[in-house]
Every structure is written in C-alpha cells, then in structure tokens.
C-alpha cells in the first residue's frame, strides 16, 4: 500500500517582464512517495549522483525545517522536470518538502501558509506559488509581506525548448545589474503592469507583445542564451503569441493559442534540432496529495 504520495508541477517564472513575480504551473511533475518509517531518512531516486539520498536532500531538509519532530521515512522520488533548466525544479522540491511535513506532522497548513513558507525558502513567490496553487500566479514579496493572486489561463498552450546545457540560477543572476536607473525601472514596470492586466483580461496578443519587451533581466541574459532572438522570431512566424526565457534560463518558454500548440511545436522541432521541444499544458491543479492511510509523525 502507498501511504502517501505528493505530486508537484513544474513552473516557469517571469514570463518576460514579470521578474520574480509572475509564475505559471506546467505539466511536468515531481512525484514523492513516502513509504515506511526508518532509522534515518533514505531517498530513493535515479537522478545524478550529486543529488543527496539522505537528510541533505532538499525535499527532506525542507520537511525537517518545517516540522523538526517528524520521524525519518523512506521516500521515493521521480521527476520529469529537467534540473537547472529554468523550469522550477528546486521550487518543486521545496514545495514537496513542505507538503511532506504538512502531512506527516498533521500541520493542516492552508495554501496561503504553504506559499508563505515556500517563499521564505525560495526568496521569491513566482515558482513556488505556481506549483502550490496551479494556474498563473502574480506575487509580490515586500519584506515579510507576501501577496499572491491566482488567475486562470485555460485558453493558452505552452511550448518549452530545452537545451542540453545546464545553466545554474546563481550564474544567470550574476549577469544582472546591481543598480537599475530610475527611468529604466519606470519603463520596465509599466510593461510588466500591462502584461499582468492583459493576462487578467485574456488579451493574449498583448500578453505576447509585453512578454517580449522585458527590460529587467532578458537583455543581460542574452549572452547566456544567444538563441532566444531567433527562437522568438520563428515562434512568432509560426503563430505563437510570445516567447521569453523560462525563469533564469536556459529553457525557452512560448505561449500559443491552445489549439495550435502541437502544430507550432512540430514546426519549431524541425528548425531547432539541437533542443528538446516539449508541448506542454498549464497545470491548473497545483500540488496533489493522495493519502491511503494516516501514518503521522
């Protein structure tokens, strides 16, 4: 019998100018199965050797920080979320750890509390809120105050172009400026405002236009992801709404009309043969827990 399983969707963040704020849950998943109690934590996985199999694993370490009193268990982890590709792999692990603690520790956390805790771990709400709530989220972190709004975007299709090369988030953040001129901040903020308004009003052409006009981060990250302009040009020609870096990169995130996503993905795959082209959907459920019996602390 499987006593407890947790499924967490991947996510993309920023959507162009919504830097560290806008996130979308995607149909790639991290699955965690909590098995029997053990003398110490054991994590069964088939990832690369650098991923810990003990209490240093991000899922376990997060769970133990959220609820230090939980007993060690054997857990099995599987995932089709690529690591260090800008698709929220670390955020999904953090969210999974919070939910494991929530279930084993009988914490009865609300969704808002999970977002608060996850944001404290991650440092920004976009990825974690999307993975917890599903759909499209717009979040703000101001000191200790976290505000998140969730909206539906069921008319959209998603394509992700995933390169073979990894790109560490710290490396991608290192190219960003430490200071931002006031006039540039005003311009960038205005574009981000219109992006969010267009998402809320389902004006998808405007969404696509705004997501390609970021000033906050993409101009500085182009040197790390030089194919972005050519992918953006082809995607638009094939009928996509817009293209942006997925999170910190190197994956590319494309929004399309839902009914055209397969056709556009096939066309892109013929052009960009060195990248994995994934036709995805927006995940609208967020974190899912299946519990067949109570196993407690």
From Swiss-Prot:
GO biological process entries: threonine biosynthetic process
Name a single GO cellular component: cytoplasm
Its transmembrane ranges are: none
Localization per record: Cytoplasm
* Entry keyword set: Amino-acid biosynthesis, ATP-binding, Cytoplasm, Kinase, Nucleotide-binding, Threonine biosynthesis, Transferase
What InterPro entries does this protein's entry cite? Answer: GHMP_kinase_C_dom, GHMP_kinase_C_sf, GHMP_kinase_N_dom, GHMP_knse_ATP-bd_CS, Homoserine_kinase, Ribosomal_Su5_D2-typ_SF, Ribsml_uS5_D2-typ_fold_subgr
Q: Which residues bind ATP?
A: 82-92
Catalytic activity, as annotated:
L-homoserine + ATP = O-phospho-L-homoserine + ADP + H(+)
Question: EC number(s) per UniProt?
Answer: 2.7.1.39
Instruction: Name the domain of life.
Output: Bacteria
Q: Does the keyword NAD apply?
A: no
- Top EC class of this enzyme: transferase
Taken from the record, one Pfam family name reads GHMP_kinases_C
Pathway membership: Amino-acid biosynthesis; L-threonine biosynthesis; L-threonine from L-aspartate: step 4/5
Molecular-function GO terms, alphabetical: ATP binding; homoserine kinase activity
Q: Which family does it belong to?
A: Belongs to the GHMP kinase family. Homoserine kinase subfamily.
HAMAP family with a match to the protein in the record: Homoser_kinase
The protein's job, in short, is: Catalyzes the ATP-dependent phosphorylation of L-homoserine to L-homoserine phosphate.
- Can you say what this protein is called? Homoserine kinase
Species source reads Bacillus cereus (strain G9842)
User: What gene does the UniProt entry assign to this protein?
Assistant: thrB
């Amino acid at each position: 019998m499987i006593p407890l399983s947790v499924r967490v969707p991947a996510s993309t963040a920023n959507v162009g100018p919504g830097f560290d704020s806008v996130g979308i849950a995607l149909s790639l998943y991290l699955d965690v199965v909590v098995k029997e109690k053990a003398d110490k934590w054991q994590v069964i996985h088939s990832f690369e050797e650098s991923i810990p199999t003990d209490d240093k694993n991000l899922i376990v370490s997060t769970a133990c920080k959220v609820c230090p009193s939980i007993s060690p268990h054997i857990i099995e982890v599987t995932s089709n979320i690529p690591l260090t590709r800008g698709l929220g792999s670390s955020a999904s692990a953090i969210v999974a750890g919070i939910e494991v603690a929530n279930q084993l520790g009988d914490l009865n956390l609300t969704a808002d509390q999970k977002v608060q805790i996850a944001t404290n771990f991650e440092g920004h709400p976009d990825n974690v809120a999307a993975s917890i709530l599903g759909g499209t989220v717009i979040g703000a972190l101001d000191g200790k105050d976290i505000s998140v709004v969730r909206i539906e975007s069921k008319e959209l299709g998603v394509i992700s172009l995933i390169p073979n090369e990894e790109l560490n988030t710290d490396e991608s953040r290192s190219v960003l400026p430490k200071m931002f001129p006031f006039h540039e901040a005003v311009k960038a903020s205005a574009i981000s405002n219109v992006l969010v308004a267009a998402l809320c009003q389902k004006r998808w052409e405007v969404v696509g236009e705004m997501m390609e006009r970021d000033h906050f981060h993409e101009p500085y990250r182009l040197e790390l992801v030089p194919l972005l302009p050519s992918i953006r040009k082809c995607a638009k020609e094939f009928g996509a709404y817009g293209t942006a870096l997925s999170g910190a990169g190197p994956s590319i995130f494309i929004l399309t009309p839902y009914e055209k996503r397969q056709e556009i993905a096939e066309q892109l795959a013929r052009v960009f043969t060195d990248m994995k082209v994934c036709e995805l959907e927006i995940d609208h459920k967020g974190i899912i827990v299946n519990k067949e019996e109570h196993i407690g602390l």
